[in-house]
Every structure is written in structure tokens, then in C-alpha cells.
UniProtKB/Swiss-Prot annotation:
It comes from Escherichia coli (strain K12). Induction: Transcription is increased specifically in response to 2,4,6-trinitrotoluene (TNT) and its indicator compounds 1,3-DNB, 2,4-DNT, and 2,6-DNT. It comes from the Bacteria. Residues 417-426 have a biased composition (Polar residues). Homotetramer. One of its GO terms (molecular function) is double-stranded DNA 5'-3' DNA exonuclease activity. Transmembrane segments: none annotated. It is an enzyme of class 3 (hydrolase). Residues 562-580 have a biased composition (Basic and acidic residues). This is Exodeoxyribonuclease 8. The lineage of its organism: Bacteria, Pseudomonadati, Pseudomonadota, Gammaproteobacteria, Enterobacterales. The gene is recE. Keywords: Exonuclease, Hydrolase, Nuclease.
């Protein structure tokens, strides 16, 4: 029997003319409801005259009725406040107590003396007072003493700068609804961005307020850092892997220019076009701009490869237009065939630090006014990376690769092991290479930067054709015998035109002993300034892992469809499903700096799964094999949702967030698919719904979901769980005291007033839940969630599973509520602690067991013995 008193109210229907009735008792909800119904009938009134009983906050008053006795006069004196949970005295009414004194409490103590020492909540004060209370505090200030409150009012005019007070008053509608925790973080980060607010601009402060509160919770830390650097960004752009894509800093594009993925694509296309003609990247000719748009529309290599690399690169939007154009323009021909080489190349040439004022040499390279090579990162020995090492004349790439393979890496393991004569040979080759580069540089200086030619010639040059007055006749690629691909193709015989090798859109790497330069056509390298730096470079023979990896999603659906597959919760998931903490989980996410142990109500489902912390689903992988935890990080995920998953997701939304159901799902009407008119109506309906982004469920599925929901509401405790005030999809973070690992969970619903946790499940066979829960490790979920709740609230909650059947029985969809026994909960607690220790050991030793041992099943052993 519950020791906590429960106060019930049954409102009377207006048509009945009966008064409302209340009852309180130290019992559970169902027993108290039954007692109330019995006493109403016993008093001669009809149950049909009243609505169903609801639980409210327990009132603390003098004229409380006796326990177990109904009171029909209670509503004459008291009424529910706006939250529909707290009782308050009606205006003009007085408690029904002859000994009532307005200045004493229920214990007869003088409230005047007590109120002198009471802590007053800060939430009810004016916004400037709440702001000032959080200023300079490491933790949120929720209550202050009476003297402290007076001090805040006195210090309001002195300690709160006028510009801050004005900004707060201008954004009252935006700041006033904030909880104390959120307001404290805003005050803290505002102090970081504007340490001297008296010298700050009012517009900047209000702009920061808007950007900060409009940003996702997990992006506010990065947003604050960007503002501290002077980058007045309005939001944080992220790459596909979740890293910060940048773009908020000032570049050579000009102040106020919004640099996004579209402008980045134009810069990359400009670099591709700059390979065949000289451009003014800051003042494009209309013909050049038209050709750039065509390159973007074609979306072919090398443009598509370089664009994707800049998009997935952390901070890829920070670079200037000059460095982007120059890096694409000067990239080795054909490097896009192996995307990993593009990543390696960009890591070497993107050396820019002042994005607003790029190096003049880089600008000249981008505009075609200089033929100097791209500056690259300098190694510890003071030399550029291997990409700029020239190759001795007469040595092929294969020979050099073989030599480097047979010789140990002396630079890495030994110091100064190269003979002096070998060093002099390298120096002489380097001098020859630099001499060739200088000659080409001088030749290009004599070419006019702009030629008065028509658009047709410009477009012809952009296609790689030689055009008088535009193309450089001294360029090695125009030497005698070397023509464009179009010219070569036109001059070939008909039999050669149909050769399979000529249909290759891009150069194909052949396994030949000698490699020909794409610019000069010669083998061996060092025949022109271009092949000296590229041909035979051993650096380009290695394959490097790409930095961006596909983020795999963990799956732990709460469905038990088909209990014969006890581990089908890892089969797939919907990233937008709100039914579970484990659904759509993203492994190895970007670490969110501001997440600290506590409970958060405003984190979206997607950002929760992209945040840090170990979840119950990941513990399931550790329990299976630790390597499965790593595998799930890297394995691709098929995000196609099954029909069963859509039904389960819709049911969870209907139960937990009914107000969101219409925003996420559309119940289709019934169509007569036997007729052409019905098929056309269905097709038109689906096309209309496709633009909404909502999930369409059939009329039969919608009817089934509603029946399942009504089945839940028909169960008294189920109705109480659904209607009780609580929080759905809240996120709880805590640290495991034994291993120090950050843990997290996302309960379907918590009811803090009574310390209950509800988890909604659907199953095809509700009877098997009593035994199949162990295969699904729901006892581990119970213990894991309960310990997380206790870490936040200091109380072990009552954890229940509300299980709804998707299979009809006797015309109804069964609904039952289960609770783990003490033995099962203890076993789950021991199990998840064992999993955390295993994870801790794997992280410390970097050893992840992956092999599973297969044993003969019982029937096979019996067969072998026969």
C-alpha cells in the first residue's frame, strides 16, 4: 500500500446539477478511485453524473476533510489554479474552520516570523532582477533570501549596465519565458562575448540573444566561441559528420557576404574553369559566369569531387575565394580519380590563416597572373611535402616506387643517413626544376590578362581548345603533336573512334612500367614543370583513409513484433522516431561541450542521438561482443522504414505526444482501388502529401492506432499514466561512479511529482512479454534508467512498461502494465555495470573482442550421440 496520500477530484457534469466531490486516502490510485465510486453511490448519487476521477496536488489547508471521507462542499471554497493541479482559495471564500487564523500555518506557527527566514524564488521576479541574479554565478540561482532580493533591487541601477538593461528590455518577449537554467547559461555566455558591455553595441547584444536562443541547444557553445572570435554568425553550419563547417568568418568575399554551400560550389567551379583560361575571380566576365553555372549543372568530376571534399571538410567554408580557386586550379590533372588523394592534396595546400586578406601570390595564381606552384605546408626538416619533390630525369614512377619500397625510411628512423653525393644530386635536380618553373612564370607575364574577344572564343577556350589571343602558345600542353581530346577524336579513323579505351571520360591508371605526363606527353617525368612535381611521386601511390566516415545509427526499437527473433531490435530504426532512447542512435557523434550531468527537456531527438554518452542500446552491443560496438559506428545504415516501424512510431506519438500526431502523420482516407477513379484519387492524394514531409498511414492503420490508444485509455492506470503531468522524451545524463563513463537515457515519459517512469512497448504477442523481456534486456533498461533518474532526483522511481498488443484478441487490442521484480531489477543492475566495466577495459586497452564461439544446439548433440 502506498504511504503517500492521493487527492482525487470527480467533477460533476453541468447537466446533472450535482456538486463536485473530492476524496483523499493513503492508497494507490485504483483503490482510491474504487472507494470514491462506492461512497458516491452510497450517498445516493449516480456515477453517470460525474466525469472520471483525476489526481491533483495534495492541498495543505486547515479544513481538509477526513481521510477516506468524501466532501461535496470542497469546491465551494477552493478551485484549481491554471495548472489544473494546485488548489487555491476562491476569491471571497474562507476556510471552513472556526479556529482559522490567516497569519498561522497548519501547525499554529506564526507565518510572519517564518517568512522572514524563507528563501524566495527568483523565477517570479522581474526579468532584469532575474538577469542580475545569474550574473557572476557559477551555478543557476533559483532562490535568494529576502535581504538578498532587496540587495538585487538596490544594485539593479549600479551593476546592470544600461546597454544590457536596454537589450534585455527590447527582447523581453524572447527572454521572459526562459527557465532559470537556460537564463543562467545565456547570462554566462553573454558575459563571455561582451566582457565590457558598457562599450558594446546594443544591436550586437540583441543579435546575439536571437542567434543564441534560435540555435540548437548543442550548438550554443560553438556559437559563443565564434562570437568571442569576432565572427557574428547567426547559426552553426555542420558537415555530414557533424563537424563545424565554418562560414561565419570574414573572407575576401567582402563584409556582409553570406558564404554557403551554393557560393562554395561557384568557387570550386571557378577553379575548374581557371584551369583552361585566366579569370578575374572578383569580377567575372558574363561568359565566364555562364560557363561556371554550366559546370555546376553538369556536376561531373573534377568539380563534383572537389566540391564534396570542401563540403565534408571541417571548416571548409572558412577559406577565402582565392585559396579555393587556386587549389582547384593547380591540382594535378587526374587526381580526382582517387578521392583520397584529393583530401591529401587539400590538406597540404590549404595553408591560409588570414582568410580576409589572402596571400597576394595565391590571388595571382587564382587569376592566372602567376604560374608559381601552390605553397604547401613545410615539414620539420624545412622542406615542402613529398608532393613537390622532383624526380630525376630518366627514372620512371614504377622504378622510383620499387626503390622506395626496398629502401627503409631513413628519415623516419635515422638522422642524416643520406650520403653527401646523393644530397648534391637531389639539389641539382631541384635547381633544374625551379629554373623551368621560373621560365614558365616569365613567359606567362607577357600574356595580357584580358583580351577583347567574343564570348564564343572564351567558351571554346574553357572547353580546352587552343584559341589565338587567349591560350598561351608557350604552354607545354600546346607543343607540337599534342592536341585536345576533341581534336584527337575528330582526326581518328572510324575504327579507332569506337575503341573502348576512347570512351573513358577520365584518365584511367594503367599498370604499365612507364607513366606519361598528361601535360607534355613524355614519360619518366621532369620533362615539363608540371610533370616534375607529379609524375612518379611516391606520395600519390599511397592510399590514405578519408577523414569523413559514414555515421552508423544504432537501433533498439521498442517493438516486439515477432518474439521469435529476440534480437530484432537491432535490425533497423527510424531517426525521427520518438518512442525510445535507443532509436535512431548515432554512434561516435560529435562531442557536445555544454552537456553536463543533469536532465534536459529541450534537446531534440536528433541532437540527443548526436551527443555524447553511452546508452542502453550500446550496452547491448557490448554485452554481445565489444567489437559490435565499433562495427555499429562504421557500418552503413539502411534508413528505409518498414511498415511495422511506421505503425509503432505513430502509436508512440499518439500516446506520448498527441498534439504532435497531426504534425507528423497524415491518415489517408479510404480509396476504392478497384476502380480507376479510386486509384487516381489515391495517386493525387499521395502526390499532395509528398510535399508536406509527413508520414502517410492508411485509413486502416489510423483506425487501428486509434483503437489501440482507446484501449490504453480504457485501463484506469493507463489513463492516469497518459494524462498525468510529466515530461515526454526528456534526456537524462549522469556519470557512472565506478568507471566515470558518461551515461544517458531518454525515457518515454517521466512523472516527477510521483517519481514514475513509463516506457511504451508494442508487441504482437502480449503473453510472451512475461518471458521474452529477458531476451530484450528490458530488465537492464529498467535498472539503467532508474539509476539515471536517481542520479538526478535522488529517488528510485517506479518504472513500468505499458505494453499494447498489435494483434486483436476477442475484438480488442489487449493492454497490460508490467513492473520488474526486485530480483530482475538487481540482475539488470549487475548486468549493465558489468557491461560498463567491459567498455572501460576496451577503451583503456584498445582491444575489442570480436569472435563468437558456436556450440552445438541440444538437438544436434542428441543427434550426434545417436
Amino acid at each position: 500500500m502506498s504511504t503517500k496520500p492521493l487527492f482525487l477530484l470527480r467533477k460533476a457534469k453541468k447537466s446533472s446539477g450535482e456538486p463536485d466531490v473530492v476524496l483523499w486516502a493513503s492508497n494507490d490510485f485504483e483503490s482510491t478511485c474504487a472507494t470514491l465510486d462506492y461512497l458516491i453511490v452510497k450517498s445516493g448519487k449516480k456515477l453517470s453524473s460525474y466525469f472520471k476521477a483525476v489526481a491533483t496536488n495534495f492541498p495543505v489547508v486547515n479544513d481538509l476533510p477526513a481521510e477516506g471521507e468524501i466532501d461535496f462542499t470542497w469546491s465551494e471554497r477552493y478551485q484549481l489554479s491554471k495548472d489544473s493541479m494546485t488548489w487555491e482559495l476562491k476569491p471571497g471564500a474562507a476556510p471552513d474552520n472556526a479556529h482559522y487564523q490567516g497569519n498561522t500555518n497548519v501547525n499554529g506557527e506564526d507565518m510572519t516570523e517564518i517568512e522572514e527566514n524563507m528563501l524566495l524564488p527568483i523565477s517570479g521576479q522581474e526579468l532584469p532582477i532575474r538577469w542580475l541574479a545569474q550574473h557572476g554565478s557559477e551555478k543557476p540561482v533559483t532562490h535568494v533570501s529576502r535581504d538578498g532580493l532587496q540587495a538585487l533591487h538596490i544594485a539593479r541601477a549600479e551593476e546592470l549596465p544600461a546597454v544590457t538593461a536596454l537589450a534585455v528590455s527590447h527582447k523581453t518577449s524572447l527572454l521572459d519565458p526562459l527557465e532559470i537554467r537556460e537564463l543562467h547559461k545565456l547570462v554566462r555566455d553573454t558575459d563571455k562575448v561582451f566582457p565590457n558591455p558598457g562599450n558594446s553595441n546594443l544591436g550586437l547584444i540583441t543579435a546575439f540573444f536571437e542567434a543564441y536562443l534560435n540555435a540548437d541547444y548543442t550548438d550554443r557553445g560553438l556559437l559563443t566561441k565564434e562570437w568571442m572570435k569576432g565572427n557574428r554568425v547567426s547559426h552553426i553550419t555542420r558537415t555530414a559528420s557533424g563537424a563545424n563547417a565554418g562560414g561565419g568568418n570574414l573572407t575576401d568575399r567582402g563584409e556582409g557576404f553570406v558564404h554557403d554551400l551554393t557560393s562554395l560550389a561557384r568557387d570550386v567551379a571557378t577553379g575548374v574553369l581557371a584551369r583552361s583560361m585566366d579569370l578575374d575571380i572578383y569580377n567575372l566576365h558574363p561568359a565566364h559566369a555562364k560557363r561556371i553555372e554550366e559546370i555546376i549543372a553538369e556536376n561531373k568530376p573534377p568539380f563534383s569531387v572537389f566540391r564534396d571534399k570542401f563540403i565534408t571538410m571541417p571548416g571548409g567554408l572558412d577559406y577565402s575565394r582565392a585559396i579555393v580557386v587556386a587549389s582547384v586550379k593547380e591540382a594535378p590533372i587526374g587526381i580526382e580519380v582517387i578521392p583520397a588523394h584529393v583530401t591529401e592534396y587539400l590538406n597540404k595546400v590549404l595553408t591560409e590563416t588570414d582568410h580576409a586578406n589572402p596571400d597576394p601570390e595565391i590571388v595571382d595564381i587564382a587569376c592566372g597572373r602567376s604560374s608559381a606552384p601552390m605553397p604547401q605546408r613545410v615539414t620539420e626538416e624545412g622542406k615542402q611535402d613529398d608532393e613537390e619533390k622532383p624526380q630525376p630525369s630518366g627514372t620512371t614512377a614504377v622504378e622510383q616506387g620499387e626503390a622506395e619500397t626496398m629502401e627503409p625510411d631513413a628519415t623516419e628512423h635515422h638522422q642524416d643517413t643520406q650520403p653527401l653525393d646523393a644530397q648534391s644530386q637531389v639539389n641539382s635536380v631541384d635547381a633544374k626544376y625551379q629554373e623551368l618553373r621560373a621560365e614558365l612564370h616569365e613567359a606567362r607575364k607577357n600574356i595580357p590578362s584580358k583580351n577583347p574577344v567574343d564570348d564564343d572564343k572564351l567558351l571554346a577556350a574553357s572547353r580546352g581548345e587552343f584559341v589565338d589571343g587567349i591560350s598561351d602558345p608557350n604552354d607545354p600542353k600546346w607543343v607540337k603533336g599534342i592536341q585536345t581530346r576533341d581534336c584527337v577524336y575528330q582526326n581518328q579513323p572510324e575504327t579507332e573512334k569506337t575503341s573502348p579505351d576512347m570512351n573513358q571520360p577520365e584518365p584511367v591508371v594503367q599498370q604499365e612500367p612507364e607513366i606519361a605526363c598528361n601535360a607534355c606527353g613524355q614519360t619518366g617525368g621532369d620533362n615539363c614543370p608540371d610533370c616534375g612535381a607529379v609524375m612518379g611521386d611516391a606520395t600519390y601511390q599511397e592510399t590514405f583513409d578519408e577523414e569523413s566516415q559514414v555515421e552508423a545509427k544504432e537501433n533498439d526499437p521498442e517493438e516486439m513484433e515477432g518474439a521469435e527473433h529476440p534480437h530484432n531490435e537491432n535490425a533497423g530504426s527510424d531517426p525521427h522516431r520518438d518512442c525510445s532512447d535507443e532509436t535512431g542512435e548515432v554512434a561516435d557523434p560529435v562531442i557536445v561541450e555544454d552537456i553536463e550531468p543533469g536532465i534536459y527537456y529541450g534537446i531534440s531527438n536528433e541532437n540527443y542521438h548526436a551527443g555524447p554518452g553511452i546508452s542502453k542500446s550500446q550496452l547491448d552491443d557490448i554485452a554481445d561482443t565489444p567489437a559490435l560496438y565499433l562495427w555499429r559506428k562504421n557500418a552503413p545504415v539502411d534508413t528505409t522504414k518498414t511498415k511495422t516501424l511506421d505503425l509503432g512510431t505513430a502509436f508512440h506519438c499518439r500516446v506520448l505526444e498527441p498534439e504532435e500526431f497531426s504534425n507528423r502523420f497524415i491518415v489517408a482516407p479510404e480509396f476504392n482501388r478497384r476502380t480507376n477513379a479510386g486509384k487516381e484519387e489515391e495517386k493525387a492524394f499521395l502526390m499532395e502529401c509528398a510535399s508536406t514531409g509527413k508520414t502517410v498511414i492508411t485509413a486502416e492503420e489510423g483506425r487501428k492506432i486509434e483503437l489501440m490508444y482507446q484501449s490504453v485509455m480504457a485501463l484506469p492506470l493507463g489513463q492516469w499514466l497518459v494524462e498525468s503531468a510529466g515530461h515526454a522524451e526528456s534526456s537524462i545524463y549522469w556519470e557512472d561512479p565506478e568507471t566515470g563513463i558518461l551515461c544517458r537515457c531518454r525515457p518515454d515519459k517521466i512523472i516527477p511529482e510521483f517519481h514514475w517512469i513509463m516506457d511504451v512497448k508494442t508487441t504482437a504477442d502480449i503473453q510472451r512479454f512475461k518471458t521474452a523481456y529477458y531476451d530484450y534486456r528490458y530488465h537492464v533498461q529498467d535498472a539503467f534508467y532508474s539509476d539515471g533518474y536517481e542520479a538526478q532526483f535522488g529517488v528510485q522511481p517506479t518504472f513500468v512498461f505499458l505494453v499494447a498488443s498489435t494483434t486483436i484478441e476477442c475484438g480488442r487490442y489487449p493492454v497490460e502494465i508490467f513492473m520488474m521484480g526486485e530480483e530482475a531489477k538487481l540482475a539488470g543492475q549487475q548486468e549493465y555495470h558489468r557491461n560498463l566495466r567491459t567498455l572501460s577495459d576496451c577503451l583503456n586497452t584498445d582491444e575489442w573482442p570480436a569472435i563468437k564461439t558456436l556450440s552445438l544446439p541440444r538437438w544436434a548433440k542428441e543427434y550426434a550421440n545417436d
